[in-house]
Amino acid sequence: RQMCIRDRYIEKVGKGVLGKNCERFENFPILIKLIDAKDNLSVQVHPDNEYAMRVEGEYGKTEMWYVVDCDEGATLLYGFKHEISKDEFARRIADNTLLEVTNAVPVKKGDVFFIKSGTLHAIGKGILIAEIQQNSNTTYRIYDYGRVGKDGKPRELHVDKALDVTKLAPAEQYPETPVEKKDGYDIKLLSKCEYFTTYRVNVETKAELEADENSFNSILVLEGEPVISGSETVSAKKGESIFVSAGTGKYTVEGKCTFVLTKID
């Protein structure tokens, strides 16, 4: 839920609510999702903007994952264990041995993964992920555990395109950043790129934040039931998303909670 249905709201009041830093984007720049994996999801890759525009006529995708919760022993796939050749990549897709060289990472609550375009990745069973991504649906499926679709046929793979765009090396993780202690809350930078900047915010009592003229703020609540007060006051529950317009100025988030804050720098 948001203060207004986002697209209708933007259409009604104008793109100024997105902020000056969003003027370089044709559409609303990000998608924010919660993904609850009840099974191993397909192994996939996203192209960069140049390839996606040339081949698909739309933008590529860079994204970030935040592990909201997970079962004990849960893992996800993130790049390769070591560098491999394009020929080996193609052979392993063909003979179903790809998982022997992919990097299976045990996860815990609070882990962060920066998934730059070209990075092979897959969410494993038993993981709840908050995903912040470029506003694009360009995805190339590489491996799907032999599953079939509703028509009884194996789901489509996009091997040739994946061979074009996949970085055949260990993934480039975003460097670890310190937690900054503030009055009533703490904040930690999770990732920063040309498409989005994300923070994890833990509120003990109250956080005083600001949505200036440069960017909207998006709040995705992971724990607690905060009250957000700015130009108006709304309450939010776990899993809900609140859109704070650029130019709102200072606003507060009150009540013990954890959320992912996203803006455009």
Positions of PLM-derived features:
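A short glycine-rich, His/Asp/Glu-containing loop-to-beta-strand
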Residues: R8-G16, P29-E56, K61-M64, E176-E208
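Short acidic-glycine-tyrosine-enriched beta hairpin
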Residues: T102-F114, G230-T248
